[in-house]
Design a protein with these regions (language model features):
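ATP-grasp fold ATP-binding core
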Residues: 93, 127-146, 166-176, 253, ...
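Extreme N-terminal starter segment of soluble prokaryotic enzymes
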Residues: 1-4
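A long amphipathic alpha-helix within ATP-dependent nucleotide-binding catalytic cores
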Residues: 166, 207-261, 293-295, 299-309, ...
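ATP-dependent carboxylate/phosphate-activation module, predominantly the ATP-grasp catalytic core
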Residues: 185-237, 270-295
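Glycine-rich phosphate-binding loop of ATP-grasp-fold ATP-dependent ligases
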Residues: 131-157, 180-182, 205-221
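Phosphate-binding site of ATP-dependent enzymes
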Residues: 152-208, 256-265
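Conserved N-proximal alpha/beta basic substrate-recognition cap immediately N-terminal to
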Residues: 7-12, 27-120, 139
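Intrinsic disorder/low-complexity segments
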Residues: 119-129
Length: 318
């Protein structure tokens, strides 16, 4: 039996809270209500179920009357929460860089920080580039801070990350970024990992979502503009290492490309559905360059649509 599909885009925040009864901020509640029909995109596919899993998601299904045996165990959810933390991505990229040993790869400055000390100011001063700081669990630009100085504002933000979530990720901020893209996967029950395809998207400086291109894989690879053989090597690495993880479901690994052609191979790992996978499903269903209204027209709220091949979430206010 497939679970009813639900669009719970607040799931990353629910993972941070780690409670069964979680209520997201009112604006996010409105977004989830306005965009509820977006779940129709994946309800009859292998992705049927929630956008993302957490204790709060499990409780929501219980309240819908779903039998306990159809829901994941609390132990599985605890492991998913660990995997979904950006702390896990820090360890993952460290191993990736050590194994692949390719000068085209970035990410060596990415690290996990669980305390602040007087030497941090010195660490800032020896670099001539800004940093981006991210809390362990957040989405679409929330829980993100970009700074080039260890000033009072930055210290306050970082102390907030430490107090609320126990740490943060520190990485170089790539001002010369020219492209956001991702590799999308599905991990099966037998540990076999399917490569679903590439996705190309646009995000703001602080990571807020803009749009995804709904195009063929050939068009997306051309947009990415990286040696296909190198992409295949990177994809094979991810498939192999995802097969070792105690998880079943969709995975998206976000990356970026800089102006000189270097690649950050793992900005973060999303162990849930994402807009890139939706873009793949929509291309399969409607083709490239399509225009579709995915949720009801909303003159005073959120709506999801594809406009001339760009999948986006729009907010309108009268």
């Amino acid at each position: 039996m497939k679970l009813p599909s639900i669009f719970n885009c607040s799931n990353d925040m629910a993972l941070a809270a780690n409670v069964r009864q979680y209520r997201p901020p009112k604006r996010i509640q409105h977004m989830e209500a306005d965009l509820a029909d977006l779940a129709q995109v994946w309800e009859d596919t292998r992705f049927a179920g929630p956008w993302g899993w957490s204790l709060a998601t499990k409780q929501r299904y219980r309240q819908m009357g779903i039998a306990e045996e159809l829901l994941p165990s609390d132990d599985w959810l605890a492991e998913l929460r660990r995997l979904s933390s950006r702390e896990f991505a820090c360890g993952y990229i460290k191993e990736l860089l050590a194994e692949m040993k390719d000068e085209r790869l970035l990410g060596g400055e990415m690290k996990w920080v669980d305390n602040l000390n007087p030497n941090d100011n010195f660490q800032f001063s020896i670099f001539n580039f800004p940093f981006i700081f991210k809390s362990p669990w957040s989405s679409s630009g929330r829980g993100v801070c970009v700074s080039s100085a260890f000033d009072e504002y930055t210290q306050k933000r970082l102390q907030g990350f430490l107090s609320s979530q126990g740490g943060f990720v520190m990485d170089r901020f790539y001002a010369d970024k020219v492209l956001d893209f991702a590799m999308e996967f599905f991990v099966n029950d037998d540990k076999r990992v399917d490569f679903l395809g590439y996705s190309v998207f646009h995000a703001s400086e602080n990571g807020a979502y803009g749009f995804n291109h709904v195009e063929s894989q050939e068009e997306l690879v051309e947009r990415i503009g990286i040696d296909p053989e190198f992409l295949q090597r990177l994809m094979a690495y991810h498939r192999e290492h995802l097969s070792r993880i105690a998880y079943r479901g969709p995975v998206g690994i976000d990356m970026l490309k800089t102006a000189d052609g270097h690649i950050h191979p793992c900005l973060e790992i999303n162990f849930r559905l994402n807009m890139g996978i939706l873009a793949l499903l929509l291309h399969e269903r409607y083709g490239a360059g399509c225009t579709i209204q995915l949720t009801p027209l909303n003159p005073n709220g959120f709506e999801a649509l594809v406009e001339k091949g760009k999948l986006m979430i729009a907010y309108r206010r009268q």
